[in-house]
Amino acid sequence: MSQDFINTDNHTSNLSSNNLYTNINAGNSIMSEELAVKDNSNSTVASDNTERTPCDAENGSIYTTGRSVVSDNAGNQDKGKNFPNGESSSASGKSENSHADDENDGSTENNSKLGQPSFSYDSEIFQLCQHYLTTKNHQGLALVARQKGLPPFLRFKIWPILLKHHPFVVNPFIEPDNEVNNENDTNTEEDLKSDIKRDLLKYIHRLNYTNLIDLNNASPEEQEVFKILESSILKFVKKWGKIMKYDHALTWIALGLAEWFPPIPNTSWVLVGRDFPSSKTSCIKNLFHDYSNYINNVPNLNEYLEDLVNDKEIINMSFRDVYERLVLVLLHAPEEKIKNKSKDLLGPKKINRKILPINGGTIEERVSFFIYCFRKLLPELSQYFQEEQILNKFGSHDDEWLIWWLKWCGSKVWSRLDRGRIWDLIFGWRLQNFKKSNSYYVEKLNLSDNLINKLGPDNFWSVSKDNDDSTIENYKKSSSFKDLINELNINESSNSNSPTSNSPSNSSINEDLLPPSPLSSSSFSSSNIAPADEFNIPFSKLDPHVELLFVTLALLKSKENTLMELDQHEIRQFLSRLPTKSINISNKYKHFKPQESDMNNNIISNDSRNNHKIDFMDNIINESGELWRKWLWSEMIDDN
């Protein structure tokens, strides 16, 4: 048997139909052209009674843009004062006096001590992002999203643009559910509404498990938010019901979107997410509140954000339209003709590890590929999981966490902070149009060599094109992975000026797998340096769901020591509610705290003077690229 194929008999035979949708009786999904081009549709108008708002547990008040609205029990709060972006005088004081325990891992129990989330951003890239947003340059926004992530407080404007132009929305395909045509299914629209409402209430209970909230007694804004969510989910299921039936994960996707995109038009109200204390008496908050330190450090950013909230020119999509496109991206699967070719030649229970990284696969194929990579890249943790009978089989209540991670892209189980950064990566995924020259993209994106250097190469780069033939000849590789590497590097092959090394390394993997950084003086001679307009733009190489798979492996690697101290039940519980990767540094480690932001490197931080945090998500995404290259290298060696 060829080593290119993974036998999935041991992994997918026990997959529960409750968790995974197979591709039986699959058909082509059809979407009207308006989905890819339509900007606005029917939108719900916010309640007129804006003065009756829920209480913010931190400050005693909750804010609309540029104005504070004092709650009934505000008591000692300043009344009638105007604060930029709704920030009260007590907000910064609370943030600066917050400290975490020495062993704080960012879990929900410790989030009350986290203060504002960790966030730092290069000012030049931020200005570039603003320019792309103003000019509606979706290619530029996608580039920033996948390379550096988006400023969190701009996602509400940028995500709709990225989703509108995403390749999976322009050419959608959702893997059909083989149970969707079940004749015994007698669920009515009222039953569907009841299911959606029940799942929405689970979110509220998850936030306020010590203080249950009755939506009938909630503020008008909260009621309206959940009403919009319910109608958006219902509309999606009714439209796409012939392809897939309702799953409660669809509600959690909508809730995840509402944590960054305000459901009520022209407001900044978003759901709080589980990163906040459970004592909160409100389910909504001002999107900009968490990033006030950063916003106040950028001149005129307050006014800019206020204008964006009320803007209808850049993008004007309703929540339901953004939600529909979001689901199409997260649940995209390869078209049937691609899968049929593989099945006709290889058999239904074999997946080609050469093809899947580029073309993607069904959720069953991705789960099998994940387990294969997991055992190869993290052998000790994989062995411990086997001893604890984790990932040995799939049932309705066993290892459902992996389905939430891989199929539903972290909905429900990941922190909103971590999920937001990973969704940036997925939404920014773009392949290069080979009909366009590289200089066209440089000019179109208005990039200097300095900005290209700051953005860096694609995170999932592989061996350089000039190294392909000599490397594979040196190690006598099979045509399988030579073809894979050639396909991964077709971008470089279209550009004769790509600056790469001319010979493989004889000593180390890192030297052999050189990143295609255009400004690395050590990787090429001065005679090979291309003009600035010929530098390579970092386009995506792997399928976005395969990128997510390696991000998942990086997350597991980051928690390997913790996981190996837990038993079976604790592991599943931990992975079903993964702590945020943004943690706080306590007084014990203050001597490791960096000094004030270096103005020379143009980095602006959201940290306050006495409250420094670390956001590990960029490290996680970088590590996922390293794991990809480690896997690719090991496959090349094994094929020898």
From Swiss-Prot:
Q: Does the keyword Cytoplasm apply?
A: yes
What protein name does the entry list?
A: Oxidant-induced cell-cycle arrest protein 5
Subcellular location(s) per record: Cytoplasm
**Gene from which this protein is expressed:** OCA5
Source organism (scientific name): Debaryomyces hansenii (strain ATCC 36239 / CBS 767 / BCRC 21394 / JCM 1990 / NBRC 0083 / IGC 2968)
Which residues does the UniProt record annotate as the domain Rab-GAP TBC? Answer: 149-430
**Record's family?**
Belongs to the OCA5 family.
Compositional bias, Low complexity, is annotated for 85-95
Q: Which GO terms describe its cellular component?
A: cytoplasm
SUPFAM superfamilies documented for this protein: Ypt/Rab-GAP domain of gyp1p (SSF47923)
Alphabetized UniProt keyword annotations: Cytoplasm
Q: Which InterPro entries match?
A: Rab-GAP_TBC_sf
Q: Where is the composition biased (Polar residues)?
A: 39-48, 61-76, 107-116
Q: Does the keyword Cytoplasm apply?
A: yes
The annotated region (Disordered) lies at: 39-116, 492-520
